[in-house]
Each structure stands twice: as structure tokens, then as C-alpha cells.
Amino acid sequence: MGEDDPKGRQRLKLLLVAARHHLSGPDLRSVVHYLERDDVGFQVTLQLADPSQQPELLELHRLVITPALIKLSPAPKQVFAGSNILQQLKGWVPRWQQDGVVSGLGLSLRPTELDGSRTQKELQLEDQLLVLRQENETLIDRIHAQERLLRMVAHELRTPLTAAALALQSQRLGQIDMTRFQDVITRRLEEMEALSKDLLEVGTTRWETLFNPQRLDLASVSAEVILELEKLWLGRNVEIRTDIPSDLPKVFADQRRMRQVLLNLLENALKYTGNGGHITLTMLHRTSQRVEVSVCDSGPGIPTEEQQRIFLDRVRLPQTSDRTTGFGVGLSVCRRIVEVHGGRIWVVSEPGEGACFTFTVPIWQGQGQEWGQAVLTEGELEP
């Protein structure tokens, strides 16, 4: 796409702003294949831009969510964003073709009945209305993206606050010494400071920019999480079993986000496991590309019809007892964190036999590994 066109077709210049893991998905591949078709009727020039390498494009084109496809020429500029770019494009290409025919005739011609009932001006007004509707849909997508970021950060704030409160209670009861108390409070304050920065960036950033992937020892992270939750399980005689091989490879992930996923899953398991029950944390090196992590409990289980819904935004299942509050925003946050890392998350459960939540994380491949490479390998994006 982009060379001189022997058929003399009008040039259509497009800019696709997308991260590498977006380009590996079927949605954007379908967009590219569609633009390569002869019946599109244009000489298409498609430029690709990675927002992590060219962040100025987000401000220039007022983009909050990616991927986004931008029509640069012919004017007017249009922006298509969200999960249905191909459908939007198919609706607009015929109109662009018609606009090209009309402009080729020259604007000095008197308005004519192009389709037997509507004049050129009426068609132009209709196109302007459709542009406004499309911009409104894009704005709604941006608002939803910001809402998801806010829910994630707000939900994550609970963890350091709860840990600080438990540490204060333990210190007052003489269960921990002053040195450990100060260490816990210092770490929790650092976490809250980082979260406050996330909140300040919610209105201007993308979801992916809140992640800092690095070489990570997931076994050590899980040990810290279990220790942090000990006040919740020791007093109830709940046994936490771990099955983590000593040769488990390091993963390529954001430490804060992986800790958040493990905390959410273990907290949910503790909520639904009765006194005297057990929880199992397992980590397996399934392939050369990923580590598989499972958190299984001996609770009441999850109804089959609810097992897909629990990972959706704004879904909270009814509580099963006075002690539980239902699966809520935490699982949708877990799903998004795992997917940004290039993995997936699912649950296996039978009523009365507990629930087992499993997610995958990419393995650290070496110093040259880039963010998004794991997603290209897995090829598993949002369902």
C-alpha cells in the first residue's frame, strides 16, 4: 500500500496508532486485509505508529484509547477507535468513495439529485451528522476507559490501607515489634504514593502506561502476599498450601500488578473458604513461553452460568453468606492486568467443590525482551 496507483484512484492516507500486541490481534489484521482489497476504491497509504514510541500522537489526535485508526486525507480528519474499527470503516468507505466522485466533478456544478431524492448539500449535512455521532461514540469509549482505570486504582488502594491498619492493630497488641511495624508502614505509604500518581495520570494516560514490566521472581511475590494476609487465615485455622517448584523460571511482568492479582485471588479464596478449610497456590512451568498460576479453594464453588460473568466490568455476584461480599470489581481488574501482560485468566468450578482460578504470565526471555512481545506470542487478547 502506498505506491503510485496505475488505476488513477484517489489517495486515502490513514494512520494506525497501535501497540505491538494490538497488531497481533485478529481485529487489526482484518482491518489491514480489508484495506488491501481492490473494491475499497482508493490508493491506500497506511502508516503504523506505536504510541509507546510516539506518545505525542496521543495528544495531537486527542486519543485516550488505542488502537485507533485516523483518516488524515482527504479531509475532514476522522478517528475510529474501540473494538469495532472494521465495522466503522466498512460503513464509511462507500461514503468516501461517493465524496471522491462528487469532488471530481467540481463544486461549480449546481446541486443535483445524486440518489434521486437528496441533494449534495443534504448528503454533506448527513455526513457531518454521522461524523458527530462517530466522535460521540469515541468520546464514550474514552470515558469508559478512564472509568476502568479509576476503578482499578481505587480498588488497589484498599490493600495498603488494610495492611497498615492490621499492622497498627498488631503493634498495639504487642504481636510485632517497632522495627517491623515501621517497615510495614513505610512500604504501604510508598504504595499509596505510587497509586496517587496513577490517579493523577488517569485522565491523560493509557492503561498500558501504568505497567512497568521487568524480570520478576513470582515465587517471592507470592510469599510476601501470603505473609501479608496471615492475619486473615491464621485465626480461622485455614491451611494455605503451596506447590511452587524451586526451578520456576522468572517471569516478565509488573511487580505491583502481579502482586495485585495474587492478593485479589487469595483474598477471594479466603472469603469463600470456611474455618478449617484449605487453599492451594500452585505455579507450573507449562511451556517455554509462560508460567501458569492457580489459586484453588475449598469453598462453595461458583455456579456454571456465572463463571464467565465474574470477569466482566460492573458485575458483582450475590453474597453467599454474611461474611462474604460477592466477587466484585477485583476480578475484572485481574482479567485486564493479565491480558495486558499477554496472558489469560479463567475459572474451573463445580458447585459445592470449590473454585480454582488460573492465569498465565510470560516467561522472562532475556534483556532484549520488549513489552508486548509476550502478547504477540500468546495471541490471546480480550474475548
UniProtKB/Swiss-Prot annotation:
CDD domains, A to Z: HATPase, HisKA, KaiB_like
One biological process term in Gene Ontology: circadian rhythm
Modification sites for Phosphohistidine: 155
GO MF annotation, one: phosphorelay response regulator activity
Documented EC number(s): 2.7.13.3
Histidine kinase domain segment(s): 152-365
Keyword Nucleotide-binding in record: yes
Main EC class the enzyme belongs to: transferase
SMART domains according to UniProt: HATPase_c, HisKA, KaiB
Keyword tags: ATP-binding, Biological rhythms, Kinase, Nucleotide-binding, Phosphoprotein, Transferase, Two-component regulatory system
One Pfam family from the record: KaiB
Swiss-Prot/TrEMBL catalytic activity: ATP + protein L-histidine = ADP + protein N-phospho-L-histidine
Subunit note: Homooligomerizes. Interacts with KaiC. Participates in the KaiABC clock complex, whose core is composed of a KaiC homohexamer, 6 KaiB and up to 6 KaiA dimers. SasA and KaiB(fs) compete to bind to KaiC.
Function: Member of the two-component regulatory system SasA/RpaA involved in genome-wide circadian gene expression. One of several clock output pathways. Participates in the Kai clock protein complex, the main circadian regulator in cyanobacteria, via its interaction with KaiC. KaiC enhances the autophosphorylation activity of SasA, which then transfers its phosphate group to RpaA to activate it. In addition to its output function, recruits fold-shifted KaiB (KaiB(fs)) to KaiC to cooperatively form the KaiB(6):KaiC(6) complex (independent of SasA kinase activity).
Domain remark text: The N-terminus interacts with KaiC, while the C-terminal histidine kinase domain autophosphorylates and is probably responsible for self-oligomerization. The N-terminal domain stimulates the C-terminus to autophosphorylate.
Name the record gives this protein: Adaptive-response sensory kinase SasA
Name of the gene this protein is made from: sasA
